[in-house]
Amino acid sequence: SKGTLLNQADFILTLMSVFWDEGRSNLELFCRETRNPDTKDSSPFNYFIEPDPDQLLRASIAYGFKRARLQNVYNVLRGKDLDTGEFSDRRRNKQFKILQKAQEEVLDIQNWHEFFKVLVSAGFRRGDVISSETGLIYTYAMYLIGKNDYKVDPFELRKTMARWFFMSALTARYSSSAETQMEQDLNNLRSVKTGDDFLSLL
């Protein structure tokens, strides 16, 4: 249920408070600033989405861990070995470094605003015509994967992600069982080796 999903996100946010409080604070500040029009060039304010911390956390997890199911990521962030069930501080620290690097990209102002050009290319001008914020968040994660992991040409990436987002919105791809659908989409990336492969998959 949706309540369960929110609780899982809350568990991870609580872990962040304990082991990486600066990361949670940065996440919450970014979300607040999306709601405040600002004259600064570096403001995350936009006309598409006013995200909550749990939404951008999902983007970081999808991008960094290539996972959508938060329960599994919660366990690895606690330092749990999913095969043996054992916990270790070293494993936890390693996983938090992955989350830290992912969140840096998700909260990067240039990435954030470049992504909105994808939505404009898809024919969207504002958030009230977008039916699924989850779809937007997951598309942002896929955009970052294409940009950073596969070094896709910026023009080709924008064009392909615009088509991906438009079709996702049209088919309500992430409107129900969003975690399951995104988990499948991320699993499909396992066979992708090049930027061309990434574009072909989408």
For the regions a language model picked out, list residue spans one by one.
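A cross-family structural signal marking well-folded subdomains
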Residues: K2-I12, F19-L202
